């Protein structure tokens, strides 16, 4: 139950001063909160518990489980979970239709943070919904690399003032599902029904709507497990050093 690297277990590998490690991490869940930090809650991750880190090559994907016709609206935020001031909101997407799905990417986020002191996390907030429960409206996944060092990373700016900089970009992910559903057609034995009260398939979307974590790169992953500590039995974690 720990992250494995190609050379063994990650942990005491930052003994050399100024050595920079890059670790690939991924996480999938149906919860509204998705961490982007090596916080102590994930003690099973044998990641250095001191030093500094910066998230790079971040890809957050929201996969809808509902039709866009439901008109469920929401926003995605990247926040500092220990800061209660307005500046805790480091990034906020525009309001969007959750049924369309969403992809948020950031190549070089301007965060250079002490490990464990500033746990960052994505938060999905449903603003408008006709459903009483929101737990099954979507699933989220994030894949990112953690650049870690025993000393502050000079290539990465401080977190101060980062909220004012457009470090991330987003785009609807619904077009991906339309492209993947092309050419499906009807099976040969299926015929159109002329009955006025026949069952209609209108409004049903393919399970590929919005993409999924399977679309994220996974060739380099060497460890994967189910973790219930975060309150979600379907959460999946994996990681590998690069």
From Swiss-Prot:
Domain of life: Viruses
Residue ranges that the Swiss-Prot or TrEMBL entry lists as coiled coil: none
Keywords from the UniProt entry: Transport, Viral movement protein
Presence of the UniProt keyword Transport in the record: yes
Biased composition (Basic residues): 188-202
GO terms for biological process, alphabetical: transport of virus in host, cell to cell
Compositionally biased residues, Low complexity: 203-223
Short name of any one Pfam family annotated for the protein: TBSV_P22
Region (Disordered): 162-242
Gene Ontology cellular-component terms listed: viral capsid
Role summary: Transports viral genome to neighboring plant cells directly through plasmosdesmata, without any budding. The movement protein allows efficient cell to cell propagation, by bypassing the host cell wall barrier.
Family designation: Belongs to the tombusvirus/aureusvirus movement protein p22 family.
Designated name of the protein: Movement protein
Source species of the chain: Pothos latent virus (isolate Pigeonpea/India) (PoLV)
């Amino acid at each position: 139950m720990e992250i494995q690297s190609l050379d063994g277990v990650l942990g005491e590998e930052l003994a050399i001063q100024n050595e920079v490690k890059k670790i690939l991490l991924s996480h999938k869940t149906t919860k509204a909160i998705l961490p982007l930090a090596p916080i102590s809650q994930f003690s099973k991750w044998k990641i250095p518990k001191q030093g500094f880190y910066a998230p790079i090559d971040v890809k957050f994907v929201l996969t809808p489980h509902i039709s866009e016709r439901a008109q469920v609206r929401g926003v995605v935020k990247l926040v500092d979970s220990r800061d209660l001031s307005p500046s805790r909101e480091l990034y906020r997407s525009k309001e969007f239709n959750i049924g369309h799905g969403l992809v948020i990417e950031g190549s070089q986020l301007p965060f250079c943070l002490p490990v464990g002191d500033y746990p960052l996390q994505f938060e999905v907030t449903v603003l408008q919904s006709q459903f009483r429960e929101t737990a099954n409206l979507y699933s989220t996944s994030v894949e990112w690399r953690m650049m870690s060092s025993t000393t502050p990373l000079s290539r990465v700016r401080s977190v101060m003032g980062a909220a004012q900089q457009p470090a991330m970009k987003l785009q609807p992910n619904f077009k991906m599902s339309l492209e993947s559903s092309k050419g499906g057609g009807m099976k040969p034995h299926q015929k159109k029904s002329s009955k006025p009260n026949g069952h209609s398939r209108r409004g049903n979307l393919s399970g590929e709507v919005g993409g999924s974590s399977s679309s994220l790169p996974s060739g380099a992953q060497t460890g994967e497990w189910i973790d219930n500590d975060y309150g979600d039995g379907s959460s999946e974690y994996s990681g590998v050093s690069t």
